């Protein structure tokens, strides 16, 4: 009798482990691998500005006080200079930042038009993060360090850049937003 019970327990543990693994894989399929790589083609379609708002609300008071989105003059006029890529690569986008320029804080979410361009957009945001580090390196080392600790992550057809006091929390907020948008 003990043998049967232990076999049942082992089977139950195996089933539970399998269910947990499947749920992790299902989430990863919507947001690429845990390294931020692009996904298998799942497409989410929500306004990038909604993602930015959700993230900035989740991270709280970070010095970010302005948000612009694709279609607004501040976004359209500055996109190529800030990110070094053509606006034609994205179908939507928004970024939030500290308008005083006193901090490196920035949250950017871009919806990429073609899956083939995700890596190019991701690289552009990584370059932007490095540029922010250089911008503050000479006179505000704490802001340069913040930029150095920033996160760039691809989820579905979106690419995220988070530079703030807790970039891991910003990344988590982005992933949570995208997970809810995928459902």
Q: For each predicted feature, which ranges?
A:
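Bacterial N-terminal signal peptides that target proteins for export
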Residues: 3-18
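C-terminal motif of bacterial Sec signal peptides marking the signal peptidase cleavage site
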Residues: 26-30
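Bacterial signal peptide processing site
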Residues: 32-35
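Short, compositionally biased low-complexity segments enriched in polar/charged residues
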Residues: 68-104, 116-121, 147
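Short amphipathic alpha-helices in soluble, non-transmembrane regions
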Residues: 121-128, 173-179
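A short, solvent-exposed beta-edge/loop patch
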Residues: 142-183
């Amino acid at each position: 009798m003990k043998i049967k019970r232990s076999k049942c327990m082992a089977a139950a543990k195996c089933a539970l482990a399998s269910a947990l693994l499947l749920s992790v894989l299902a989430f990863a399929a919507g947001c690429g691998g845990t390294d931020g790589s692009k996904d298998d083609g799942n497409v989410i379609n929500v306004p990038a500005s909604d993602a930015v708002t959700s993230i900035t609300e989740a991270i709280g008071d970070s010095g970010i006080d302005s948000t612009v989105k694709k279609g607004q003059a501040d976004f359209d006029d500055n996109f190529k200079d800030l990110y070094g890529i053509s606006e034609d690569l994205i179908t939507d986008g928004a970024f939030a930042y500290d308008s005083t320029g006193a901090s490196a804080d920035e949250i950017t979410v871009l919806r990429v038009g073609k899956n083939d361009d995700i890596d190019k957009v991701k690289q552009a945001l990584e370059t932007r993060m490095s540029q922010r580090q250089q911008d503050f390196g000479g006179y505000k080392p704490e802001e340069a360090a913040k930029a150095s600790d920033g996160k760039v992550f691809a989820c579905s057809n979106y690419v995220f850049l988070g530079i703030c006091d807790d970039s891991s929390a910003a990344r988590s907020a982005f992933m949570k937003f995208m997970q809810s948008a995928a459902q």
